[in-house]
Amino acid sequence: MSEEQPHANLAVPAFKTEKEPITQTRNGQSSVWRFGGSDKAAKASTVTLRGVIYMLFDNCGKDVNKTILPLGHGDPSVYPCFRTCIEAEDAVVDVLRSGKGNSYGPGAGILPARRAVADYMNRDLPHKLTPEDIFLTAGCNQGIEIVFESLARPNANILLPRPGFPHYDARAAYSGLEVRKFDLLPEKEWEIDLEGIEAIADENTVAMVVINPNNPCGNVYSHDHLKKVAETARKLGIMVISDEVYDRTIFGDNPFVSMGKFASIVPVLTLAGISKGWVVPGWKIGWIALNDPEGVFETTKVLQSIKQNLDVTPDPATIIQAALPAILEKADKNFFAKKNKILKHNVDLVCDRLKDIPCVVCPKKPESCTYLLTKLELSLMDNIKDDIDFCVKLAREENLVFLPGDALGLKNWMRITIGVEAHMLEDALERLKGFCTRHAKKTETETESLQALKLSDNNLEM
């Protein structure tokens, strides 16, 4: 697979390494402003999905008589069929009316919410978490930020999956962590390349990230594979950061297994939340869970660093923290079943339609997540250089936005969002088929027929 960094082919703003002083004049006297914008986030901002999506929207054709179909990013909450369950809404309303969610909370989160998260996670674990093992965050993304800041030290590196979730790359860049990539293997149903991990790790490696259920591949790792991951991490002396935010979004046959089950082998730091399972990303509530029966996080001062970083960052809204126990305890299984049934239907719909589009292939149906990864067979197409070129021209000609795989570290692949209403996917696939037909390489017979037709037209004109 390509060693290029995500977004390597996309234009990004240039930043001066030295800022020129800006002079201002007033009443005939000149002085220099002593402030200026920082470029600390410049590198991190070049590996975010938003920049790619905005670029594709900018390329949508203003003269194309079709509505824009935004299937490059995922937010199912905007569609009525994915509205969250009434129990979750009632939990927030009850706290709002009680007035119990209006105050500040402690940096780690309010105790009832931390206890509820521990109880929720303990259903899948052989050891028991306590509230002291749980730290609430403003969504899973803030959890990533807290953990990366807690691990950052001079020369440290972290192992991230390819393809992966670009926010990890962005936060590593912001925190000064060197990123090293290990591959997920499509020919092995996106399993982790464990031999590759051993090849890239060294004495400065601090952790590896496992996303399970996987975003963007949609696979769910088996018990045996996760045990091998834990054994590999222990051999290397590194912790495992397990992103499990899609644990309630599974519609395949493989059951979800929490990485925390293997905490007796290696310390596991779990990142999770309710944004995906309950389809409420705007509520911004997630958590960090320390699966560490041997107390390694305390002796290595990772626990201390997490607490210190939480002290200097914003807390999740207290009103949502206060509602969290009821949200977790009163979860309606029928809601999850309905949501996952819709996603499964959408996966089947897309895969069925792709059978008629030879240049776009889905090697493996996803079993989780809200995306579907497809491989572009560019050898079957004319005048398409790569996945970015494909997606830009698709946006320009069809007002259809898909995410190029390059943004995820997977060159010449493409990600399709399935967390939308089915009629949008039907429309999108008709547009995709038309686009691919126009750009398909002509066979020798077709080329000869076109040439003959042109000659015939010329003779008629004469």
Swiss-Prot record:
Gene3D superfamilies: Aspartate Aminotransferase, domain 1, Type I PLP-dependent aspartate aminotransferase-like (Major domain)
Organism lineage: Eukaryota, Viridiplantae, Streptophyta, Embryophyta, Tracheophyta
One cellular component term from this protein's GO annotations in UniProt: mitochondrion
Family annotation (SUPFAM superfamilies): PLP-dependent transferases
Top-rank lineage group of the source organism: Eukaryota
UniProt protein name: S-alkyl-thiohydroximate lyase SUR1
Swiss-Prot/TrEMBL keywords: Growth regulation, Lyase, Pyridoxal phosphate
GO BP annotations, alphabetical order: adventitious root development; amino acid metabolic process; defense response to fungus; glucosinolate biosynthetic process; indoleacetic acid biosynthetic process; regulation of cell growth by extracellular stimulus
